[in-house]
């Protein structure tokens, strides 16, 4: 008798990816976040689909339709806040996932790492467009400020911005196209995630020691399915706590005011997960420089594999690099805090210092430390 799980064309793919997949026996809970991101994406697609059934992408009715979802649709408020806070969970898992990749040297798996960077950009674009859809004050002004950054591109900038807007300012065409793109992008993200997994399974997972585990593997099921399920329960617990007890904790009160092009909010800021990049953007006084720094703040991840001369893949046995890694984390938290503050001293100077430190750590300090650690191996 043949085993359907191992011979059926479709089941075989699932089996080789989630059941009989040979896995290192020593990967920690930090490796759970890949599956948690998959769970977040599923939650976002399902809640988003139900929201799209009631939402209208029109400047005159968008705000009212969101109010209608919260007041009149059965459990509409739950779906709306699950979707909004689900995005926060998504980014929390993303940042930990990327941080784990940096700490344990997973960037050595180049194809997987580069697809991951593409995924990060796609998720950020999707979240930005989703924030515009409720058509509150922060939605409108956030869309205006961020899309306006493209005008810093020489020659074509202004035309490009007007092309994206579909007019001479953010309006109905902008909202309609943002809704269309916000709807389609998660499916593109799903496809990219599958390619991400495909490349990962070509080489196999990294592990905390950074050593080859080919001589000692265990099947993914039941060991890691159980472990991932525990992580999923904790994620759902946190998401439901946020949604049911503190639904507006991470939102902006300004977004409960309908969009008004004639009234600018005191200080425009994006959602918390973009604040670190926003702080880097604001720390540079001229527009083109700020835009370049903003893009480089994420794109710098692509050159990390070429800036790591260390003879050990992970930071597990490299205390100097560990110390610098946690300084980098503290620096990013500082940038996140600064991004939410008004543009005045001392916040300007703190933001500039933190931005310089961020790029210095990534490009100079950490690679130099790797060279010192290589020397220390010979002592």
UniProtKB/Swiss-Prot annotation:
Binds 2 heme b groups non-covalently. The keyword Transit peptide does not apply. Heme b b566 binds at residues 97, 196. The keyword NAD does not apply. It comes from the Eukaryota. One of its GO terms (cellular component) is respiratory chain complex III. It is found in: Mitochondrion inner membrane. SUPFAM superfamilies: a domain/subunit of cytochrome bc1 complex (Ubiquinol-cytochrome c reductase), Transmembrane di-heme cytochromes. Signal peptide: none annotated. Heme b b562 binds at residues 83, 182. Belongs to the cytochrome b family. Heme 1 (or BL or b562) is low-potential and absorbs at about 562 nm, and heme 2 (or BH or b566) is high-potential and absorbs at about 566 nm. This is Cytochrome b.
């Amino acid at each position: 008798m043949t085993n359907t799980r191992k011979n059926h064309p479709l089941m075989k793919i699932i089996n080789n990816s989630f059941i009989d997949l040979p896995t290192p026996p020593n990967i920690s809970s930090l490796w759970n976040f890949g599956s948690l991101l998959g769970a977040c994406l599923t939650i976002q697609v399902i809640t988003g689909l139900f929201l799209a059934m009631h939402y209208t992408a029109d400047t005159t009715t968008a705000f009212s339709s969101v109010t209608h979802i919260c007041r009149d649709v059965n459990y509409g408020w739950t779906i709306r806040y699950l979707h909004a806070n689900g995005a926060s969970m998504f980014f929390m898992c993303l940042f930990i996932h990327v941080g784990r990749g940096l700490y344990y040297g997973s960037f050595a798996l180049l194809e997987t790492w580069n697809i991951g960077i593409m995924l990060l950009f796609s998720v950020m674009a999707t979240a930005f467009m989703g924030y515009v859809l409720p058509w509150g004050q922060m939605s409108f002004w956030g869309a205006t400020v961020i899309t306006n950054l493209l005008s810093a591109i020489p020659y074509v900038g202004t035309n490009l911005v007007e092309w994206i807007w579909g007019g001479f300012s953010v309006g109905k065409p902008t909202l309609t196209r943002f809704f269309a793109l916000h709807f389609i992008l998660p499916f593109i993200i799903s496809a990219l995630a599958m390619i991400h997994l495909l490349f990962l399974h070509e080489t196999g997972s990294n592990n905390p020691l950074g050593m080859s585990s080919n001589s000692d593997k265990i099947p993914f099921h039941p060991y890691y399915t159980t472990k991932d399920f525990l992580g999923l329960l904790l994620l759902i617990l946190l998401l439901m706590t946020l949604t049911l007890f503190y639904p507006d904790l991470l939102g902006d009160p300004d977004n409960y005011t309908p969009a008004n092009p004639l009234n600018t909010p005191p200080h425009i800021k994006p959602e918390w997960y973009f604040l670190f990049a926003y702080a880097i953007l604001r720390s540079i006084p001229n527009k083109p420089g700020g835009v370049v720094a903003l893009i480089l703040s994420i794109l710098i991840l692509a050159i990390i594999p070429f800036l790591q001369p260390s003879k050990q893949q992970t930071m597990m046995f490299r205390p100097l690099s560990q110390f610098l890694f946690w300084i980098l984390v503290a620096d990013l938290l500082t940038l996140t805090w600064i991004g939410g503050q008004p543009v005045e001293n001392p916040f300007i100077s703190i933001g500039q210092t933190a931005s310089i430190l961020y790029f210095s750590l990534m490009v100079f300090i950490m690679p130099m430390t790797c060279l010192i650690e290589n020397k220390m191996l010979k002592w």
